[in-house]
Amino acid sequence: MKFIIKLFPEITIKSQSVRLRFIKILAGNIRNVLKHYDETLAVVRHWDNIEVRAKDENQRLAIRDALTRIPGIHHILEVEDVPFTDMHDIFEKALAQYREQLEGKTFCVRVKRRGKHEFSSIEVERYVGGGLNQHIESARVKLANPDVTVHLEVEDDRLLLIKGRYEGIGGFPIGTQEDVLSLISGGFDSGVSSYMLMRRGCRVHYCFFNLGGAAHEIGVRQVAHYLWNRFGSSHRVRFVAINFEPVVGEILEKVDDGQMGVVLKRMMVRAASKVAERYGVQALVTGEALGQVSSQTLTNLRLIDNVSDTLILRPLISYDKEHIINLARQIGTEDFARTMPEYCGVISKSPTVKAIKAKIEAEEENFDFSILDKVVEEANNVDIREIAQQTQQEVVEVETVSGFGANDVILDIRSIDEQDDKPLKVEGIDVVSLPFYKLSTKFGDLDQSKTWLLWCERGVMSRLQALYLREQGFANVKVYRP
C-alpha cells in the first residue's frame, strides 16, 4: 500500500532551508508514529510531499487513521501507483478503478501532472472524463459540486490512481517549534489549548496541580495520555504532578476571601515557571479565556503574569465556551472533561474581578513561600509513556483476568463511537456497555452482586478506571485482558 502525504500549505511558503527542515522533521515524526504498526514501513521525502509505503495490508486502516492525526499534514492520498503508455491507457486504468464508484453518480475528473508529456492536464481531464461518460451509462459529468471527483496524478511515466483522500489536522510538525508546558486540569479549556499548541509544532509537556486527591490525578492522567497518544506520540514528553493541597490550605488560612482566586493562580504560575526553568521549557500554556471566570479579566490576568518572566500563552483567550466545547468534541476530550471535577472555582465565595496589585502583594506577604518551594521540589515527574506502566503497578491489587466465571460480566468502557465501530462480542458471557465517562455516576446502579470485568482496547483506560472504582469502595471489579 502507498500513501502520499501533502504538506500543510504554510510549510510550502517557507524558505528552502526551513522547508527542508520541516519536511525532514515531519518525515521523522511519521516514522516514529507508524513504526508500531509496520516495522518494514518506508518513509520517503520529496520536495512537495512525503511518500509512505507499507507491506502489511492488515494495518491499512490503522496507518491511515494515524496519519490523519499527525500535525503538519494537510491531507493524505491513498494511491495505487501504476505505469502507463499514453492517454488512452490512463483512461482504461481509471475506468477499471472507478467504474463501480461512478454508477448512478455525477462526476468530474481532476488531474495534476509533473514531468514532460505530449499532453496537458486539461487534455487528460477531457479525454478521461469523456471516456468515463461514454462507458458508464448511468454516470453524468458535472463540473461543479459533483458526487464524485476522480483524482489522478501523472508523474513522468507513472500514474497515481487516487483511491481516497483523507484530511489531516494541518499545522506544523511537532519539534519545529520550542517546548511548552501546559497547565492541565482535565477540563475543556486546558485540553483544547494543549492540542492547539501541539498542532502548531510544539512539544507539549504537562503540569498538573492536584487539588482533589488521587481520583482527580487519575482523571487528568487519562486526558494527558489521550492527547499525547492521539496527537503527539512522535515525541517523549513529561507529566509533572504537584500536590497543591498544602498551598490551597495556606491560602485559605492566610489570604482574604476576595483575593484567593488571583493569589492561587499566581502561585500556580510561580510553581509552573520553576518547573519550566528546571527542564528548559520556553513558555507556559493555559486554557484561560477572557472574562470566562473572575480571575480571567484583563486586570487579573496582568497581575497573574507579573509573578513570572516566563512567557504565558493563552490560545483560547478570545474563544467562547461553546466554541471550546465544540473543539473538545472534535479532538475527543469532551467526555473526559464533562466528568472532571472542578476545584479552583470553589476556593473563593466573592472573588474580585479587578484585583489591586498592592493589595494582592500585601496578602501574599502572609503566605509561607517555603510551602510552595517544597511542593515543587517534591513534584512527581514521569515520562508520559510510563503512565500505562505505572497504572499497571498501582492497580496490582485489582486482579487482571483472561477468563471468566459464572458470576462475571464484561463491562465495555469504550466510548459509544468506538463500540459502534467495533462491537465487543464474547461467547459464553454477557457484555454490558457503560462508557468510561459514565462510570463515576452510573457504576453504582449496576448489579453489585456481579463481578464486573472492565475492558477496553489497549487496557490503559480499564486499569485507570479500575483503580478509581476501587478508591470509591467498589471491590467487585477486575481488569479483563483476554
Swiss-Prot record:
Listed pathway(s): Cofactor biosynthesis; thiamine diphosphate biosynthesis
Signal sequence coordinates: none
GO BP, sorted A to Z: thiamine biosynthetic process; thiamine diphosphate biosynthetic process; thiazole biosynthetic process; tRNA 4-thiouridine biosynthesis
Group of enzyme by EC: transferase
InterPro entries cross-referenced by the UniProt entry: Rhodanese-like_dom, Rhodanese-like_dom_sf, Rossmann-like_a/b/a_fold, ThiI_AANH, ThiI_fer, ThiI_N, THII_Thiazole_biosynth_dom, THUMP_dom
Catalytic residues identified in the record: 456 (cysteine persulfide intermediate)
GO molecular function: ATP binding; CCA tRNA nucleotidyltransferase activity; tRNA binding; tRNA-uracil-4 sulfurtransferase activity
Residues noted as binding ATP in the record, renumbered to the chain: 183-184, 265, 287, 296
Disulfide bonds: 344-456
Keywords in alphabetical order: ATP-binding, Cytoplasm, Disulfide bond, Nucleotide-binding, Redox-active center, RNA-binding, Thiamine biosynthesis, Transferase, tRNA-binding
Primary location class: cytoplasm
Cross-referenced PROSITE patterns: RHODANESE_3, THUMP
Subcellular location: Cytoplasm
Domain Rhodanese: 404-482
THUMP domain sequence ranges: 61-165
SMART domains per record: THUMP
Catalytic activities: [ThiI sulfur-carrier protein]-S-sulfanyl-L-cysteine + a uridine in tRNA + 2 reduced [2Fe-2S]-[ferredoxin] + ATP + H(+) = [ThiI sulfur-carrier protein]-L-cysteine + a 4-thiouridine in tRNA + 2 oxidized [2Fe-2S]-[ferredoxin] + AMP + diphosphate; [ThiS sulfur-carrier protein]-C-terminal Gly-Gly-AMP + S-sulfanyl-L-cysteinyl-[cysteine desulfurase] + AH2 = [ThiS sulfur-carrier protein]-C-terminal-Gly-aminoethanethioate + L-cysteinyl-[cysteine desulfurase] + A + AMP + 2 H(+)
PANTHER family given in the database record: TRNA SULFURTRANSFERASE (PTHR43209:SF1)
Family affiliation: Belongs to the ThiI family.
Protein name: tRNA sulfurtransferase
Organism of origin: Salmonella arizonae (strain ATCC BAA-731 / CDC346-86 / RSK2980)
